Swiss-Prot record:
One of its GO terms (biological process) is transmembrane transport. Keywords: Cell membrane, Membrane, Transmembrane, Transmembrane helix, Transport. Belongs to the auxin efflux carrier (TC 2.A.69) family. This is Uncharacterized transporter YfdV. It comes from Escherichia coli O6:H1 (strain CFT073 / ATCC 700928 / UPEC). The keyword Cell membrane applies. The keyword DNA-binding does not apply.
Amino acid sequence: MLTFFIGDLLPIIVIMLLGYFSGRRETFSEDQARAFNKLVLNYALPAALFVSITRANREMIFADTRLTLVSLVVIVGCFFFSWFGCYKFFKRTHAEAAVCALIAGSPTIGFLGFAVLDPIYGDSVSTGLVVAIISIIVNAITIPIGLYLLNPSSGADGKKNSNLSALISAAKEPVVWAPVLATILVLVGVKIPAAWDPTFNLIAKANSGVAVFAAGLTLAAHKFEFSAEIAYNTFLKLILMPLALLLVGMACHLNSEHLQMMVLAGALPPAFSGIIIASRFNVYTRTGTASLAVSVLGFVVTAPLWIYVSRLVS
């Protein structure tokens, strides 16, 4: 766990602090942070999602149907619970609630999935299976849903778009159609040659570092104030989602190792894609970025807890 913290979690904290202090010194402005996020959202993130999903194969997805169904139901359920809670309890707009759900209702499986699971459970087929399934659910299902929920409030004339126009608008975003296309290719059995990976990887490597740095810039542009909403987002991401995965997985008699990995994957900090989308559309940036920062620090405490609990009961 110490190796993971130093090698994977500490860099996130350091880069976010670097962005934060750069913002405080006005080396970069909040507008420049949005430009960084536009680069990530339109180019780096779609490339990263495409590469990560096409590494899977259809046999992986159907190898453990119960694992796929449990992950799908719980993650999508937590996504909508987060949206509903933010909209009803904290009186946010539909768009703000959509971004809240993308942050609090989605684990950062693409960036930290293998980094967390491999040192604990080994570089095995099972690890790849869990990461592939959850990655497809987060990137090919919840991101498109989130952008669809976000778009009705973002019409150019200030009026709500129709459901059809919102759907079309969401589908045009590279961060939506790239993972959906990758998932379709996986399901029909089309394998992208490994020799093509460098073509996508060069821009994809900019994804996480630039996104975390820009999150630090965004955090610097707003006064940090811990609130009940930030606590709610952190609780949902670090406690409620892994707890739901554990209980539903036990009820469905999942394989013990798969259950442990699924729970830990669900306990990961919020997906960076939510922060990128927040900054890109200038929606829910302050609370969303603060929720990410608190969740990253909280994960240091909750990760060992979920490892212990899932091993104890599975």
